[in-house]
């Protein structure tokens, strides 16, 4: 014990289990001794630590603290809280407390937790007698571990868990491991009584379970063997040691015989006498004992008969009780099953209701989604219009600035025309004086010989560029096809948007306002087609016949036959073309062609005529003639390329139209760039045909063409192949930059499409979730039906199982009766054996065995009584649970009623909200009417006041008119009256001025009020529409209200049915309570009977103990007699009689041994039969456990059904919340739509104003067109006069061309000698080259004007060809920003400037681009190449350069006019600077 007191005891007390158990003293009301003692005790404990540990250990092993803890864990377990202190000493108290603790703990595990403790029971004797031993410590540790497992599984487990959390982390981890060992059935400490059936387990789980069970059985068998061995040792120790006492006198007599034989004989005789006397006494005692034994046997027979009668009665009582229990169980299960069926029906009805609600919510959500989609579409359309509005505002500002510049350009062009006329007159005079050309000049033959070298060089230079551009075009086509394939695989919503974008609202066409077709902000065709119309060329009238034959225009008759009629009319006759142009405006026809074509190239845009101005007209006409003549050779190839590009460009447009719904500005950029690429690709054919134009100009032509071709050759400057390659490099780099930017934008568009696809997938996923929830609700409904059917089947199976169990019990009772009969037969046989007197020992042993059998039977009866008691307790608990379930059902019914009331309240609230909305609408209508009335009354009052003021002013004017007459008469009166009248006159004038100002302010207010009145009327109309919608909504809500009322009535009816069912359930519950009370009364009677039997059994046990004591005394006496008899036989060894007697005695003993062996075999047979009966009882208990498990499964299924119902309720609540969110989003969208409609009305007002301004501008354009036609006729007449003079100059043509080429290479404007013929042409070329540089240094040439439907292009041919070259060539800018801005300007109107001056539409900024491309350190040659990139940019550069040419030529002719133009350019420069960077970026 000293060894156990050392480290083992300290280690146990410092462990987790002891710490936890000692810490529970505060929970049970005990304070630790260390906290409750005085200071002196604390000092003693500090001095004596060993004593403190012993006290703490004794406090644990005493059992009192653990019993209190167990009272908290299992307050309802049998036995109650009973502790014994100091009755029979501390050891006995400890043993009794620990025994009580173990019994209650074992019952708690078996009854409450349904677990069987597999560990052996603790050695309570060791723990009570030797508490400080290692065995006692181990047993206490196992008890504490089981107590810990029970504490975390009881009803007050939260209290114990909170206490465990208050300990350290190490202790918590150790306690968690101990809890896991105790609570898990597979750990080997406990075994689950109600486990799953073998059919429900997998083969592997079955194998694992069998292995664990075999291990447990082997361990239990070993423990059983050890216990039996220990019990045998204890029984051997209990036998007295008096068997050795008779041997002492025998040894002494033997010694006496050896020493004194004589004395030995005398002593033997005396002993014989004494022995005879003792034998006689013993015979008497044997007779008495036989009589007593017979009496005992009679009593035993009587007891057996009584026990048999009692057992028969007990069996009958058991049968009756079992039958009554079975009937009661059936009767009790019927209402419960009916209740469960009713609950299932209610759940089915609730599921149907939830299903209907889910369908309604789904329909409502679909309607809300549809309305949301419509509102989003309207919102996108409104956003697009607002974006167009902003663009129109910007373009209006640009157009106003451009109109002023165009007017200035017209003035300068008129001045130039006058100067050109004077110069032409001078040139005619010089030609008449100096030149006399012979008719047959050899220059015509030599001229083509020099041109081919330059033409070949240009073709070689352009071939490389064309190949590179074609490669880039192929790459772009592949990218566009990939994008188209990706877009085609998107959601059908994009296709609907594409169809909406393809079918925009087209405004009404009015022949009086032809330009309105392109200025409507609602036409996408204007947006896209405007790019082509911005970049149109306006050729001279002589080139109309050639334009119709060009490759670009050759495509027009296929899709646009309207474009042929004006061109053919112009090509027939100049006079007829003039008449046709005057009668029918070509802009109208070409605009119609544009709208029909949609998205075409620039040459298919409308052609607007502009009057030629001077010799520049001849140059442009001849240039166009040369181009169209040289394009006929590769026409087929270019037509094929243009058709491919046309087929590709519409493929891109639907994609851009789709994406404008999301990002209008970015998509417009992408579309502009795609169209610009198509224009550049088509312009390459035009550049390739430029050298052929030179050849056609140099060859023999018709008189009119040759006469126009000479000035074109003079003004045309062809660079060398090296210069052409140098100029092609920046253009190619710009094209590559545009291609890279297009690729980036395409990637951005793909990202946006992917995001949109993800949003569509999210919406489809939501729809799928809703459908899955609906399907799940249907599945749960079907499962509920199936579970109800399964419950019915299980109930039938339970009934069958109960019947089989009753049959098995009857069989067991019959087997017990058979055992009793076998025992009676064994008793009869034993009676036969007990008739022999000498065999008393065998009879006593048989009596002991019979008594033990009776004890075992009594124990069986007691165990059965305990089982019946436990079953009754279980029945009570089930009845209590049934009562609780009935209460829960009542609570649920009340909860359902509350939910129905809440639903009714919600409907009332919803109806009230609808009424409030109606009242709000009515209030708004009243307010609008009041505001309108107030506005009308205020206007009327203001008008009345104005009229009154006007009348007052008229009266005062009349007075003032009469005042001079009064003055004339009053002057005679005196000077004082004159002064007073003068003061009055001044005051009257002041009053007049104030009245005029007030009148103007009132007029402004009146206009403002009229605008407000219009807006209020629009709002009133919107409110009327909203009120109509609200009325429709209210009608729908009233219909829904009627439906909800019908549903409410149906629910009330169902509620009445449920209440009736609840009443029936309560009546059934009362009946079950009555039955339960009857059962309790029967149980009390049985308990009293059992108590009486227990008292009788106690009396029998007392008598049995007395009989045992007598039997032991008889056995002692018998042993003494046997010893003496053996001594006598030893002494009479020499006597033959004694030997014969001894042999006979031995034979008898052998026969007795044989009989005893037979009895032992019979006993073994009876024990085997008893074990079989116990096995049958175990099987019956197991089947009962299975029935309990099935009952638990039914409960779990019911819990699952309730959980599914709760999930359905949660899903319905989520759907309601989502519908509320959709309502809120719909309200927000309606407000946004109202705001957008207001913006739309404002935009429409502005558009009307712009249309009026456009109409005024179109009238001005017509006037300018008429003037230009007149000036063109004048120029035609002058050109016919010049033809005769120009034919004489062909002989010196070759020399002049060489001089011009030298002049191109040198680019140094020096004076040429006038001695040679044609020197005035070189001077002319110098004058044309010089101002181009000077114009660039001054900030670029003035801004030209172009565009489809624009009328500022009528100012001259330099403006007609300018946009074509700029836009088609792409040299001016590498970004589509100018195209986008100019395109937006085609679809919008103008606003008047501050000064009232009107400006023209569709003007462009070519000069800004060229000026931005120059740098201060450039040489004149570089600047010339930048302005004139060669044949590739011939139209644009030439027209741009020619526009500056005439400014410069004017400067060389007259210096004062040059100063004026420079001042005009300096005045226009600030306006251009803020627009040029945006166009050249």
Curated annotation (Swiss-Prot):
It is a peripheral membrane protein. The modification Phosphoserine is found at residues 441, 649, 1353, 1384. GO terms for cellular component: centrosome; cytosol; endoplasmic reticulum; Golgi apparatus; membrane; nucleoplasm. Abundantly expressed in immune cells, including both CD4(+) and CD8(+) T-cells and in myeloid cells (at protein level). Expressed in endothelium (at protein level). Expressed specifically in spleen, bone marrow, lymph nodes and thymus. Expressed in liver and heart. Gene3D superfamilies: Calponin-like domain (1.10.418.10). It comes from the Eukaryota. The keyword Nucleotide-binding does not apply. Disruption phenotype: Mice show defects in T-cell functions including impaired maturation, significantly reduced activation, reduced cell division as well as impaired cytokine production in response to specific or non-specific stimulation and during the course of infection with the mouse malaria parasite Plasmodium berghei. It is found in: Membrane; Cytoplasm, Cytoskeleton, Microtubule organizing center; Endoplasmic reticulum; Golgi apparatus. Residues 200-225, 258-491, 731-1308 form a coiled coil. Keywords: Coiled coil, Cytoplasm, Cytoskeleton, Endoplasmic reticulum, Golgi apparatus, Membrane, Phosphoprotein, Stress response. InterPro entries: CH_dom_sf, HOOK_N. The keyword Protein biosynthesis does not apply. Residues 542-557, 568-590, 1371-1386 have a biased composition (Polar residues). Residues 660-695, 1453-1472 have a biased composition (Basic and acidic residues). GO terms for biological process: cytoskeleton-dependent intracellular transport; defense response to protozoan; positive regulation of cytokine production; positive regulation of T cell activation; positive regulation of T cell proliferation. Residues 430-458, 494-731, 1331-1481 are annotated as: Disordered. Homodimer. Interacts with DOCK8. Interacts (via C-terminus) with intact microtubules. Interacts with dynein-dynactin motor complex. Interacts (via C-terminus) with HSPA5. Belongs to the CCDC88 family. Acts as a positive regulator of T-cell maturation and inflammatory function. Required for several functions of T-cells in both the CD4(+) and the CD8(+) compartments and this includes expression of cell surface markers of activation, proliferation, and cytokine production in response to specific or non-specific stimulation and during the course of infection with the mouse malaria parasite Plasmodium berghei. This is Coiled-coil domain-containing protein 88B. It comes from Mus musculus (Mouse). The gene is Ccdc88b.
């Amino acid at each position: 014990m000293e060894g156990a007191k050392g480290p083992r005891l300290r280690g146990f007390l410092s462990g987790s289990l002891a710490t936890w158990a000692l810490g529970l003293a505060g929970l049970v009301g005990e304070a630790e001794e260390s906290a409750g003692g005085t200071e002196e005790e604390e000092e003693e404990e500090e001095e004596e630590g060993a004593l403190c540990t012993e006290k703490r250990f004794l406090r644990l092993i005493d059992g009192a603290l653990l019993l209190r803890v167990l009272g908290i864990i299992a307050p309802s377990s049998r036995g109650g809280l009973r502790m014994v202190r100091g009755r029979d000493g501390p050891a006995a108290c400890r043993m009794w407390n620990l025994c009580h603790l173990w019994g209650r703990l074992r019952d708690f595990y078996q009854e409450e937790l349904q677990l069987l403790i597999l560990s052996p029971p603790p050695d309570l004797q060791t723990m009570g007698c030797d508490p400080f031993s290692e065995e006692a410590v181990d047993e206490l540790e196992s008890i504490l571990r089981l107590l810990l497992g029970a504490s975390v599984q009881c009803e007050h487990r939260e209290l114990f868990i909170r206490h465990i959390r208050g300990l350290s982390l190490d202790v918590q981890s150790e306690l968690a491991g101990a809890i896991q060992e105790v609570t898990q059935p597979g750990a080997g400490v406990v075994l689950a009584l109600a486990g799953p059936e073998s059919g429900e387990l997998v083969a592997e789980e079955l194998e694992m379970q069998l292995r664990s069970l075999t291990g447990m059985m082997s361990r239990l068998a070993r423990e059983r063997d050890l216990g039996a061995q220990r019990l045998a040792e204890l029984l051997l120790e209990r036998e007295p040691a008096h068997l050795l006492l008779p041997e002492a006198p025998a040894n002494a007599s033997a010694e006496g015989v050896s020493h004194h034989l004589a004395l030995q004989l005398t002593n033997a005789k005396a002993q014989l006498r004494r022995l005879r006397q003792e034998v006689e006494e013993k015979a008497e005692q044997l007779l008495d004992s036989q009589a007593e034994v017979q009496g005992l046997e009679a009593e035993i027979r009587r007891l057996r008969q009584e026990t048999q009668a009692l057992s028969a009665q007990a069996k009958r009582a058991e049968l009756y009780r079992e039958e009554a229990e079975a009937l009661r169980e059936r009767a009790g299960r019927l209402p419960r099953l009916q209740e469960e069926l009713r609950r299932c029906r209610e759940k089915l009805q609730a599921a149907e209701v939830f299903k209907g609600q889910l369908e309604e919510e789904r329909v409502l959500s679909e309607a809300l989604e549809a309305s949301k989609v419509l509102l989003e579409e309207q919102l996108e359309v409104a956003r697009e219009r607002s974006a167009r509005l902003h663009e129109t505002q910007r373009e209006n500002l640009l157009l106003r600035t451009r109109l002023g510049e165009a007017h200035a350009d017209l003035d300068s062009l008129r001045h130039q025309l006058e100067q050109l006329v004077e110069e032409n007159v001078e040139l005619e005079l010089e030609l008449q004086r100096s030149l006399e050309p012979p008719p047959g000049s050899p220059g015509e033959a030599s001229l083509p010989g020099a041109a081919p070298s330059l033409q070949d060089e240009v073709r070689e230079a352009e071939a490389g560029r064309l190949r590179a551009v074609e490669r880039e075009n192929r790459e772009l086509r592949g990218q566009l096809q990939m994008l188209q394939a990706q877009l085609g695989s998107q959601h059908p919503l994009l296709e609907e948007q594409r169809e909406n974008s393809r079918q925009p609202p087209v405004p009404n066409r009015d022949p009086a306002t032809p330009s309105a077709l392109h200025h409507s902000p609602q036409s996408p065709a204007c947006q896209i087609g405007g790019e082509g119309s911005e970049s149109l060329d306006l050729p001279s009238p002589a080139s109309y016949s050639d334009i119709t034959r060009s490759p670009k225009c050759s495509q027009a008759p296929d899709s646009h036959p309207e474009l042929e009629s004006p061109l053919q009319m112009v090509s027939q006759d100049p006079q007829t073309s003039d008449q046709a142009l005057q009668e029918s405006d070509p802009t109208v026809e070409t605009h119609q062609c544009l709208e029909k074509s949609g998205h075409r190239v620039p040459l298919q845009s409308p052609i607007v005529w502009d009057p030629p101005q001077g010799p520049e007209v001849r140059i442009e006409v001849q240039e166009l003639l040369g181009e169209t003549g040289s394009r006929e050779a590769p026409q087929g190839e270019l037509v094929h390329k243009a058709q491919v590009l046309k087929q590709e460009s519409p493929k891109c447009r639907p994609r851009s139209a789709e994406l404008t719904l999301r990002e209008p500005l970015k998509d417009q950029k992408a579309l502009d760039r795609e169209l610009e690429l198509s224009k550049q690709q088509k312009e390459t054919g035009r550049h390739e045909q430029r050298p052929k134009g030179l050849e056609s100009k140099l060859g023999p032509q018709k008189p009119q063409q040759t006469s126009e071709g000479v000035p074109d050759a003079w003004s045309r400057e062809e660079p060398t192949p090296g210069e052409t390659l140098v100029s092609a490099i920046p253009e190619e780099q710009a094209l590559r930059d545009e291609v890279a930017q297009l690729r980036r934008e395409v990637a951005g568009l793909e990202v946006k499409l992917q995001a949109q696809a993800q949003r569509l997938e999210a919406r489809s996923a939501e729809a799928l979730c809703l459908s899955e929830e609906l399907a799940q609700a249907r599945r749960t409904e079907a499962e509920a039906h199936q579970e109800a059917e399964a419950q019915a089947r299980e109930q039938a199976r339970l009934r069958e199982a109960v019947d089989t169990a009753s049959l098995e019990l009857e069989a067991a009772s019959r087997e017990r009766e058979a055992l009793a009969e076998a025992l009676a037969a064994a008793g009869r046989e034993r009676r036969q054996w007990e008739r022999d007197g000498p065999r008393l020992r065998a009879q006593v042993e048989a009596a002991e065995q019979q008594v033990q059998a009776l004890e075992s039977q009594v124990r069986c009866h007691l165990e059965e009584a305990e089982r019946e008691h436990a079953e009754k307790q279980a029945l009570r608990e089930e009845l209590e649970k049934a009562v609780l379930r009935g209460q829960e059902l009542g609570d649920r019914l009340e909860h359902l009623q509350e939910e129905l009331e809440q639903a009714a309240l919600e409907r009332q609230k919803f109806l009230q909200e609808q009424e409030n909305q109606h009242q709000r609408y009515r209030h708004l209508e009243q307010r609008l009417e009041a505001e309108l009335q107030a506005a009308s009354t205020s206007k009327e009052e203001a008008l009345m006041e104005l009229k009154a003021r006007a009348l007052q002013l008229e009266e005062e004017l009349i007075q003032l008119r009469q005042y001079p007459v009064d003055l004339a008469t009053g002057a005679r009166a005196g000077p004082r009256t004159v002064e007073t009248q003068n003061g009055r006159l001044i005051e009257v004038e002041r009053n007049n001025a104030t009245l005029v100002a007030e009148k103007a302010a009132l007029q402004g207010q009146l206009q403002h009020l009229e605008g407000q009145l219009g807006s209020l009327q629009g709002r009133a109309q919107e409110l009327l529409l909203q009120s109509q919608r609200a009325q429709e909504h209210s009608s729908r809500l009233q219909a829904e209200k009627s439906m909800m009322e019908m549903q409410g009535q149906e629910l009330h009816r169902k509620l009445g049915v449920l209440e009736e069912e609840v009443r029936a359930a309560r009546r059934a519950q009362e009946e079950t309570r009555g039955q339960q009370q009857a059962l309790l009364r029967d149980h009390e009677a049985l308990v009293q009977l059992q108590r009486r039997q227990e008292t009788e059994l106690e009396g029998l046990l007392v008598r049995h103990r007395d009989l045992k004591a007598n039997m032991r005394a008889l056995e002692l006496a018998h042993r003494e007699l046997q010893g003496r008899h053996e001594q006598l036989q030893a002494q009479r060894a020499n006597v033959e009689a004694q030997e014969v007697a001894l042999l006979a005695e031995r034979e008898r003993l052998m026969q007795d041994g044989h009989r005893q062996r037979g009895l032992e075999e019979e006993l073994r047979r009876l024990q085997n039969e008893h074990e079989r009966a116990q096995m049958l009882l175990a099987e019956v208990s197991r089947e009962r456990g299975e029935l309990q498990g099935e009952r638990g499964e039914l409960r779990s299924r019911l819990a699952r059904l309730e959980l599914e119902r709760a999930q359905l309720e949660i899903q319905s609540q989520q759907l309601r919340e989502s519908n509320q969110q959709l309502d809120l989003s719909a309200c927000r969208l309606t407000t946004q739509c109202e705001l957008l409609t207001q913006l739309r009305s404002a935009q429409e007002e502005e558009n009307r104003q712009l249309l009026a301004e456009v109409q005024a501008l179109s009238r001005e354009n017509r006037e300018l067109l008429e003037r230009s036609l007149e000036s063109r006729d004048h120029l035609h007449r002058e050109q016919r006069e010049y033809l005769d003079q120009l034919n004489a100059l062909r002989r010196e043509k070759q020399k002049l061309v060489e001089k011009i080429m030298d002049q191109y290479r040198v680019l140094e404007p020096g004076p040429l000698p006038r001695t040679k013929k044609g020197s005035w042409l070189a001077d002319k070329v110098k004058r044309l080259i010089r101002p181009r540089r000077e114009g660039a240094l001054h900030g670029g040439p003035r801004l030209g004007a172009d565009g489809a439907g624009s009328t500022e292009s009528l100012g001259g041919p330099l403006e007609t060809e300018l946009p074509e070259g700029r836009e088609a060539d792409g040299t001016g800018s590498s970004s589509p920003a100018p195209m986008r801005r100019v395109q937006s300007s085609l679809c919008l109107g103008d606003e008047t400037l501050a000064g009232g001056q009107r400006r023209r539409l569709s003007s462009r900024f070519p000069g800004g681009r060229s000026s931005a491309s120059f740098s201060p350190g450039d040489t004149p040659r570089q600047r010339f190449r930048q302005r004139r990139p060669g044949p590739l940019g011939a139209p644009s550069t030439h027209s741009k350069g020619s526009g500056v040419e005439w400014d410069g030529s004017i400067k060389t002719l007259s210096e004062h006019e040059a100063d004026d133009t420079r001042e005009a350019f300096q005045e226009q420069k600030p306006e251009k600077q803020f627009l040029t960077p945006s166009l050249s970026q």
